[in-house]
Amino acid sequence: LTSFGETLYTRGLPGLTMTDVAKNAGIGRTAVYNYFADMGELLVAYALDETERFLNELRAGLEGIENPIDQLAVYIRLQINDLARRHLPPGPAMRSMLSPESYAKLGKHVHELQMVLAHILSAAIAENYIPKNDIRELAMLVHGSLSSSAGRAEDAPDEETRERQILNTIRFIQMGLGARF
């Protein structure tokens, strides 16, 4: 899975083959096929592994933080960092590559991640930190902003600029949701 992630990061998904992954890992292609039947299965395994890793990191980051606006800041920061370090194709591209069963398996895992954001947003509304609104719509706006921000943070010339971009993104999303501090 590490080799797949490295190869995906450097080459992107279009045209990526099991041979490329095996070569990067320094093993024969047959060894990869012993674990994964095809590229779709490998992609799902990688995505599930990365999502689980991210969920654990997110849970640890949120531990002890009670204010939902502060939780949202942690969520945004970790998402930007995660999106910058792993390049999974967006949902529609993955759907076209995967069988309906594989896509559904991935969807269950992604749903767990979406529920973390939904919980944060629900708490922010319940505690009057943001105005009442549709949670799904708010989550889509948050994720849309995150997707466009991840590339900017990744391309920052230095750590200070990157940190400023992340803080600006956090504040932009919080203010866009109508946050009261």
Short names for language-model regions:
Residues 77-116:
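Short secondary-structure transition hinges
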Residues 45, 49, 56-85, 138-142:
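Hydrophobic alpha-helical connector segments
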Residues 131, 135-139:
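Membrane-interface starts of transmembrane alpha-helices
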Residues 61, 90-97, 149-156:
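Secondary-structure edge/capping motif, primarily at the C-terminal ends of alpha-helices
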Residues 1-4, 21, 46-50, 54, ...:
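Generic hydrophobic, amphipathic alpha-helix propensity
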Residues 43-47, 51, 103-114, 139:
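Amphipathic, non-transmembrane alpha-helical scaffold segments
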Residues 74, 115-127, 144-181:
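C-terminal peripheral helix-coil segments that are non-catalytic and often amphipathic
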Residues 3, 7-41, 45:
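Helix-turn-helix
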